Design a protein with these regions (language model features):
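Long, basic/Gly/Ser/Thr-rich N-terminal segments
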Residues: 1-97
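Switch II of P-loop NTPase G domains
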Residues: 60, 64, 175-228, 235-244
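Flexible phosphate/Mg2+-sensing switch loops adjacent to catalytic phosphate-binding sites
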Residues: 85, 91-95, 124-165
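Hydrophobic anchor at the beta1->P-loop junction of P-loop NTPases
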Residues: 102-104
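Walker A (P-loop) phosphate-binding loop of P-loop NTPases
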Residues: 109
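Conserved lysine of the Walker
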Residues: 112
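A conserved segment at the C-terminal end of the G1
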Residues: 115-125
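Conserved C-terminal guanine-recognition region of P-loop GTPase G domains, centered on the G4
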Residues: 193-196, 216-341
């Protein structure tokens, strides 16, 4: 993996040069000081500043990535790196690996929280292992995931509550991403090498995607995404819903489909948000890959033609590689389903 010159903070999404990274003292005896950068990120009320250990830059090391720095206050060495803009602690893979901010977008009650909760568990327990790697949670990520989505979905066997809007309640944790480091082994010239990827997942309320002003405030991460998963609720398509019995529809949806924002409206706002951020013209093509994904697929399985690839188990993990033939088959089948929705 080539040496990075810049990185994107997985918390505030500002882009910085690697040489601008800061460190935070970890010596408990070092005096706490007001941290205005972290305060602005957390709640914006500078009259009640968050307190923390001092932050500072490492001496210039040329092209090399600084590994540590000495605190100018207490003279102790620290390895804790933080973002220069928001002072949140950063995973080492942010500097050394590839940034992979994954945005999951969709209207209210499409199942975004469930999708993130399940895909994270699949990556941890199955996918990373089958591909000869491992996925580790950063800081308190694993604790928050296990106590939240994992506990309710896998232990209590219950559905998750609808995510609260970050605008209505800034303390609900929705703005704090789940950050993981995915490590994958590959063959090098003389020995095996390990590539690391910083995976960043968000659980965003559907109503936070309903207008452009809100999106530009609480969904800035979309513009920095390495990929966008566009979640589609089949219950919100009349042609699909009319083929299902009323009980199936009511069990799968807690929001009246007539009140849900149209999927094409959300995608149009996402596109405009990215174009404005990048100052792109309307005729320019956005280079962020988008995957259209049907949620609640079990509810519509009876409507899928027998023998379809999407009804079969994915072969990727069993083979320990990405199966291009399977991908092409699934892609064409989902495109076909979308064309009749």
């Amino acid at each position: 993996m080539p040496l990075k010159s810049k990185f994107i903070c997985p918390f505030c999404f500002e882009e910085h040069k690697i040489s601008d990274v800061q460190f935070r003292c970890t010596n408990r005896r070092c005096k706490d000081v007001p941290d205005l950068e972290l305060t602005r990120y957390e709640n914006g009320d500078e009259s009640i500043p968050k307190m923390g250990k001092p932050t500072f830059k490492a001496p210039s090391g040329g092209l090399s990535i600084p590994k540590s720095a000495r605190c100018p206050e207490c003279n102790s060495i620290t390895y804790a790196i933080v973002c220069p803009s928001c002072h949140n602690k950063l995973p080492e893979s942010t500097l050394l690996g590839r940034d992979m901010i994954i945005s999951v977008v969709g209207s209210r009650d499409t199942g975004k929280s469930h999708f993130v909760g399940v895909i994270v568990n699949e990556l941890i327990e199955r996918i990373s292992v089958k591909f000869g790697g491992a996925m580790e949670g950063f800081d308190d990520t694993m604790q928050r995931y296990k106590a939240g989505a994992y506990q309710k979905l896998y232990m209590d066997m219950q559905k998750l509550d609808l995510t609260q809007s970050s605008v209505q309640n800034v303390n609900n944790g929705a703005y704090r991403p789940l950050i993981f480091t995915l490590k994958l082994k590959h063959k090098g010239l003389f020995k095996d090498k390990i590539d690391s990827y910083t995976l960043v997942f968000f659980d965003t309320a559907g109503e936070d995607l309903n207008d452009e002003d809100t999106m530009s405030t609480v969904n800035k991460y979309i513009c920095k995404s390495a990929g966008i998963i566009f979640l589609l609720d089949p219950m919100q398509f009349p042609t699909v819903r009319n083929q299902l019995d009323e009980n199936t529809v009511s069990r799968a949806s807690s929001v009246d489909w007539k009140q849900a924002t149209r999927s094409d409206d959300i995608m149009a706002r996402v596109s405009k948000l990215i174009r404005n951020d990048r100052r792109m013209k309307s005729e320019q093509k956005i280079d962020i890959p988008v995957a259209a994904v049907f949620s609640k697929f079990d509810a519509i399985a009876s409507l899928i033609p027998e023998g379809s690839t999407v009804l079969e188990n994915s072969p990727h993990c069993d083979e320990g590689r990405f199966d291009m033939a399977d991908w092409h088959n699934v892609d064409s089948e989902i495109r076909s389903l979308l064309s009749v929705c």
